[in-house]
UniProtKB/Swiss-Prot annotation:
This is NAD(P)H-quinone oxidoreductase chain 4, chloroplastic. It is found in: Plastid, Chloroplast thylakoid membrane. NCBIfam families: NDH_I_M (TIGR01972). It is a multi-pass membrane protein. It is an enzyme of class 7 (translocase). The gene is ndhD. It comes from Populus trichocarpa (Western balsam poplar). Keywords: Chloroplast, Membrane, NAD, NADP, Plastid, Plastoquinone, Quinone, Thylakoid, Translocase, Transmembrane, Transmembrane helix.
Length: 500
């Protein structure tokens, strides 16, 4: 048990500081923005300090644990803790949220509410990744919905209410299955419910019941990841959301679903995961091909990047369901890698829209000459997205490939077939990304526009872009930085699988 409540502070600080925003004057947009950035940076620095000094990389057990009695009526504890699986997503959350807050500079309408919602999301995300209690996990999962819905409905495009409603219907509807699964596990074979992850991991269930639990959790996580065919909310949401919200959606929110698949479906329900993993690998391979092909046909820039996110999450699904050391480590690396790259692409698409007020690719052309800095950053990060060697995406996808090839669960021919289909997906990725760059940056369409003079990237845009690019290159050169966080935890998870 940790003597100092680091994790409780990390969960409570952003939302508590967010409430103070409403004390600020209505017209203090600049003060509110810098106050929010200060809180985000302070949180990130505190997390970096605490994890550097108190987290042991070679210990696969839960660390920095905190457990406080919350509700006596049914023995509910505020139970937090982190391990190698949650450490990476927590640091990613702090990094991306800080940059998304800095990216939200153009927001002036209802600035106090906007920045409060950003901080509320921050707390919910940290709480979810550090939760060691099923009911607390569900509460943090739900805490995300209201801020995201309001951010979509109030700061977005013309169809923002439609996309926000679609988002809430999908995510809130699927959350019912998450709650049912959590309650089922808690009340099984006991008059006194226990939501503790550790207790649930050591519990055995009848096969049929475990499959039902697995399906319930899978539906909830498949919507958030997303996994086809439960992905249709994502392109509409990204297409209408402000780009700072898109950064949080692509960088963190989608990763919550993949994290839940590992933390609950794979770790708590290992027998059911063994049964479903073969089918989910097929779904993951189809998802890579389908989303990449669909992305090529999108005329809306943000929707093209959104389908790119769906395609890349297919690699995460394959890695998780390979039930191999390399595959699961590759999936975790892909979660971190795509968190950076996806957030960067949506940020750059938003800054481009701020300048040219165009979102359809067939209306663009010639941005390379008018805005060379944006062209340079967009090109580099697009190459990172298509897994260029030396970038983080390359090692993530490569390790997932090795993971499925070396998986002991599957026969040789299915592994070769899945690898071949997945490889086709990697060929489709440069097709839609390079086509996107050609339509945006080459040609002469913008030269003929009435206001043909456009401002290039400023210091703020360059800082955010470079800040995201640096970890993408660093992980691409030295991926052991991420692997060192997760390798011991992955071995502990796979010890439940006899063919691992």
């Amino acid at each position: 048990m940790n003597s100092f409540p680091w994790l409780t502070i990390f969960v409570g600080l952003p939302i508590s500081a967010g409430f103070l925003i409403f004390v600020f004057p209505h017209r203090g947009n600049k003060v509110i923005r810098w106050y929010t950035i200060f809180i985000c940076v302070l949180e990130l620095l505190l997390m970096t300090y605490a994890f550097s000094y108190y987290f042991q990389l070679d210990d696969p057990l839960i660390q920095l644990t905190e457990s406080y009695k919350w509700i006596n009526f049914f023995d509910f504890y505020w139970r937090l803790g982190i391990d190698g699986l949650s450490l990476g997503p927590i640091l990613l959350t702090g990094f991306i949220t800080t940059l998304a807050t800095l990216a939200a500079r153009p927001i002036t309408r209802d600035s106090r509410l906007f920045h409060f919602l950003m901080l509320a999301m921050y707390s919910g995300q940290i709480g979810l990744f550090s939760s060691q209690n099923l009911l607390l996990f569900f509460i943090m999962w739900e805490l995300e919905l209201i801020p995201v819905y309001l951010l979509l409905a109030m700061w977005g495009g013309k169809q923002r209410l439609y996309s926000a409603t679609k988002f809430i219907l999908y995510t809130a509807g699927s959350s019912v299955f998450l709650l049912m699964g959590a309650l089922g596990i808690a009340f099984y074979a006991s008059n006194e419910p226990t939501f503790n992850f550790e207790t649930s991991a050591n519990q055995s269930y009848p096969v049929t019941l475990e499959i039902l639990f697995y399906i319930g959790f899978l539906i909830a996580f498949a919507v958030k990841s997303p996994i086809i065919p439960l992905h249709t909310w994502l392109p509409d949401t990204h297409g209408e959301a402000h780009y700072s919200t898109c950064m949080l959606l692509a960088g963190i929110l989608l990763k919550m679903g993949a994290y839940g698949l590992v933390r609950i479906n794979m770790e708590l329900l290992s027998h059911a995961h063994s049964i479903f993993s073969s089918w989910l690998i097929i779904v993951g391979a189809i998802q890579i091909i389908y989303a990449a092909s669909t992305s090529s046909g999108q005329k809306n820039l943000k929707k093209r990047i959104a389908y790119s996110s769906v395609s890349h999450m297919g690699f995460t699904i394959i890695g998780i369901c390979s039930i191999s050391d390399m595959g699961l480590n590759g999936a975790i690396l892909q979660i971190i890698s795509h968190g950076f790259i996806g957030a960067a692409l949506f940020f750059l698409s938003g800054t481009s829209y701020d300048r040219i007020r165009l979102v359809y690719l067939d209306e663009m052309g010639g941005m390379a000459t008018l805005m060379p800095k944006i062209f340079m950053m967009f090109s580099i990060l697009s190459l990172a997205s298509l897994a260029l060697p030396g970038m983080s995406g390359f090692f993530a996808e490569l390790v997932v490939f090795f993971g499925i090839i070396t998986a002991k669960k599957y026969f040789l021919m299915p592994k070769i077939l899945i690898t071949f289909v997945t490889a086709v997906g990697t060929i489709l990725t440069p097709i839609y990304l390079l086509s996107m760059l050609r339509q945006m940056f080459y040609g002469y369409k913008l030269f003929n526009a009435r206001n043909s003079y456009f401002f290039d990237s400023g210091p703020r845009e360059l800082f955010v872009s470079i800040a995201i690019l640096l970890p993408v290159i660093s992980i691409g050169i030295y991926p052991d930085f991420v692997f060192s966080l997760s390798v011991d935890k992955v071995e502990a998870i796979l010890s439940n699988y006899f063919y691992s």
